[in-house]
Amino acid sequence: MATPVPLVFNAPKRGMPPTHFADLNDEARIEALKELGLPKFRLNQIARHYYGRLEADPLTMTDLPEGARQEVKDALFPTLMSPLRVIETDDDTTQKTLWKLHDGTLLESVLMRYSDRSTLCISSQAGCGMACPFCATGQGGLDRNLSIGEIVDQVRNAAATMQAEGGRLSNIVFMGMGEPLANYKRVVSAVRQITQPSPAGFGISQRSVTVSTVGLAPAIRKLADEEMSVTLAVSLHTPDDELRDTLVPVNNRWPVAEVLDAARYYADKSGRRVSIEYALIRDVNDQDWRADMLGEKLHKALGSRVHVNLIPLNPTPGSKWDAAPKARQDEFVRRVIAKGVPCTVRDTKGQEIAAACGQLAAEESA
């Protein structure tokens, strides 16, 4: 039997990138411009280029003095990531990008285009320390936290792609590599930049941003106290502690009841419905009694402020885990709904290009 991967909450300090414009607050940006001999009104111009026009190269910012553009580029706009592989599928509506960061670390994002919206799935860490055994990223371990700039620039890149196509990036989900609430301060700062109107941010509605977590209960409560209206998604995967201790090892620290209490606190503070993510795994967590228990526990803890997203498992190469058959999936949905909890099956865009957690990076590293 393989040795279990350990839980890691504190990311290694190594490898953080050079400081980027998005890493700094306005005071620090003004100070950086002052060091370049530029007045503070240039901040507004640069911000409008970055957040409004989605430009990250000061050499194209023609309203900046020509002699200062290279200096601004060198000081505030280092190259954070370069595309290593881009794969498209679902009739070119799904685009998976594997990015190589400045230190060689790999990062993934997935852009999914629908008829009525476009959604970007972004990463918050390079790797993940939560050690979930059915997740490719969790089994690969944690390399490091991403910087604010590395998170934000995933969004800018995708927004620029959509803009070039005549569309608009409408939704952001923190469901890529990493545990967002384990990189708390940077993720919250990134969310604020994603949602503030230009020139302070990209102007995407907070209600169109989803932050997922495996259940870091204190951080869920802390996020609630930020008084943002982002959607909270809790990766529960089973309603009983006995199995969840194995499927989601962080459950040994914060068990199901504590996670659901924190989720209720978030729902009460934000007024938002909480999303429960449940990867259905054949003969592991797909039993009728678990569906009944899930519905009962969620209805008791969250009432009408909950929705279950059932996720057909994306099998990882070489893994013993497999997706539950459709008939089992349909019965699971029926039983959860019968307990008074809305339950739907999540769209599986990107499965054929290994768009599930960390699979593309795992293949590249192999």
Swiss-Prot record:
Name of a matching Pfam family: Radical_SAM
A cellular-component GO term for this protein: cytoplasm
Domain Radical SAM core: 114-352
Cofactor: [4Fe-4S] cluster
EC number assigned by the record: 2.1.1.192
Binding-site residues for S-adenosyl-L-methionine, renumbered to this chain: G178, E179, S212, S235, L236, H237, N314
Keyword Ribonucleoprotein included in the entry's annotation: no
Subcellular location: Cytoplasm
PANTHER family: 23S RRNA METHYLTRANSFERASE, RADICAL SAM CORE DOMAIN-CONTAINING PROTEIN
Name the record gives this protein: Probable dual-specificity RNA methyltransferase RlmN
